[in-house]
Amino acid sequence: MKRGSQGEAGSPQTEEPEPLFSEEDRSLRDGNALDESDSEESQYSGLEDSGTDRSDDEEDHWSEEEENPGKSPKEIIKVPNRSSKSPADSAADEEDRPNEIKEYENDSSDEEDIRNTVGNIPMEWYKDLPHIGYDLDGRKIFKPLRSKDQLEEFLDKMENPDYWRTIHDKKTGQDIKLTDEQVDLVERLQKGQFGDINYDPYQPAIDFFTHETMIHPVTNRPADKRSFIPSLIEKEKVSKLVHAIKMGWIQPRKPREDTATYYDLWAKEDPNSILGRHKMHVPAPKLPLPGHEQSYNPPPEYLMSEEERLSWEQQDPEDRKLPFLPQRFNCLRAVPGYARFIHERFERCLDLYLCPRQRKMRVNVDPEDLIPKLPKPRDLQPFPTIQSLIYKGHKDLVRCISVSPSGQWLVSGSDDCSVRFWEVSTGRCMKSVVLEGAVKSISWNPNPGLVLVAACVDRSVVLINPGLGDRLLCSATDQHISGYQPPEEEVQQPVTWEEVEGAQYSNGLRLCIKHQKEVKQVTFHARGDYFAVVLPDNGNSQVLIHQLSRRRSQNPFRKNKGQVQKVLFHPTRPFFFVATQRYVRVYNLLKQELTKKLLTNCKWVSSIAVHPAGDNLICGSYDSKLAWFDMDLSTKPYKVLRHHKKALRAVSFHKSYPLFASGSDDGSVIVCHGMVYNDLLQNPLIVPVKVLRGHAIHRDLGVLDVTFHPTQPWVFSSGADATIRLFT
């Protein structure tokens, strides 16, 4: 049935749609199709005969009679057979029907394009042929002529406003101009939208299957007959399988034998195995790329002069920087053959199979992981941050300072031949003692029961009672010194002990220990009865230890290895530290033996300080390094700090806080947090927390000495600018 008849039968009450063809066109089209199918002249129509042609024609006639109930079949237009007419008759018929609608002017949107009768076949078949297929009569459908060259295509692209909406149809071979609706459809598809603009993808969903049990089913379709009748096809398949099993054509699968498999752990290590050869294979290094000197026209600086050429010829082949002489040619055609080509290939072959190769493992490490995660300085307070007081009074370099055990008094020695005593809290100079020479080192006795200060002046060590503080302590100190009873038998000593009398005694001087050479340093033992001095000499008596109560002196070493710079007593154990230019030796005074030898990795040691616990030591040097030693860990530095820009003059530990400081010739004092844990498995924590500046640089000298307050987190520093500064 035709679509029109179906529409009339399905909806008789709706308005009849306007037909695409008139009745005459319909009969004309049917007649043409009928005549063409019955034509005897067409040798090949491209369609197979089917038994439905006649029935279709009869249905068409019945539909025409239904559409034209008032007309008889004789009134229906009959189109004569075109194949039986001559070309002249067909032309005359076309002139007689000027108003007749032509067949190619209208086409259905639902059917295939009637202008192309070749069918939906790949157009690549006729890619190299002049035609695109055959029509219903078997005649070739030639491609339309496309004589446009590139210039015409470009002009058409520039001048034709509809060029952008014109496409080429491969099936018909014609250019088609897209309508606005088609362009809108293409744009919507490119954007990923639906082609139909009226389509709503978000329509409300209707849930057919819910939790509520309905009375009527959703679908009441009856079951198929094949659903309850045994399948004959399956019966035949089963019978074939049974027959094959009986004949022995189908055998059951044999179970696999489970054999024990063992994994070879050393397969990759064996160089004879495939895995081992693959693992041990190292590709050969590539040849270096040629440089400018190997060019046929190198720059002038790569060409050798006559003197350089003679020198190159006189050298041995292994000493030459280049194995050839760079030359210049006008063009590449003038370059002769390379004479060393075979020799270089031979050397390359020797390198490939004679030189061993080594694989270097490249470790990808994040640079952030190499930086230690240190706590923030504000979490490590208290520590000195600002300059609070300036002690002025000296007229020359203040080389040394020391604090009393109570922390109330400060003593300083200067090159102006004076020793001054200061009150820490007010900055007032309480007393000044003028000596015979410049004061190189000074130390306050750590025993809180004595008020005694030792100062190094030229070749003497002077013991001074400043008379400050408690008068009972001052008188007890004088009684301790004057209560000495000389031995019955005099013992030969390397020094001379002399008591001071007269004006010097009233000025505070009590004892004077005269040495044979200039004294550089003095330091007290933790109990205050022993003190050691350093004589800067290459002899055997560089270090002397004095006992105050018995007024005895002794040389603990028969021979000194190197020039001694500093000495220190261990705070709790009978150990004695001796620092030479490059090493720090630790001696046991009871056993009289060398315990350890610390390697400082410095060029010249300037100062040392021992942690109050006694297991760690810091060492400053003139090459701007500060080395921290963990003596329980190693004889090498645990950490080396290079924070200062110039030589370090002094280092010091705090007695109760985890702080240490260093003074340098750059005029700065750097305070660091140095926490030592009781757990031996945990390394010390070292964090620089503050850089203190204030001293002026004078004669290329900055900070000369540094010491901490015994109870407060304060630090004192003396400098070449003749001042002492307190940082709190």
From Swiss-Prot:
Regions crossing the membrane: none
Species of the source: Xenopus laevis (African clawed frog)
Positions annotated as WD repeat: 393-432, 434-474, 514-556, 559-597, 600-639, 643-682, 698-728
Protein's UniProt name: Ribosome biogenesis protein bop1-A
Positions with biased composition (Acidic residues): 55-67
Entry's Gene Ontology BP terms: maturation of 5.8S rRNA from tricistronic rRNA transcript (SSU-rRNA, 5.8S rRNA, LSU-rRNA); maturation of LSU-rRNA from tricistronic rRNA transcript (SSU-rRNA, 5.8S rRNA, LSU-rRNA); regulation of cell cycle
rRNA processing keyword on record: yes
Composition bias, Basic and acidic residues: 68-77
Chain segments carrying region Disordered: 1-114
GO cellular component: nucleoplasm; PeBoW complex; preribosome, large subunit precursor
Protein role: Component of the PeBoW complex, which is required for maturation of 28S and 5.8S ribosomal RNAs and formation of the 60S ribosome.
GO molecular function: ribonucleoprotein complex binding
Keyword annotations: Nucleus, Repeat, Ribosome biogenesis, rRNA processing, WD repeat
Gene3D superfamilies: YVTN repeat-like/Quinoprotein amine dehydrogenase
Chief location bin: nucleus
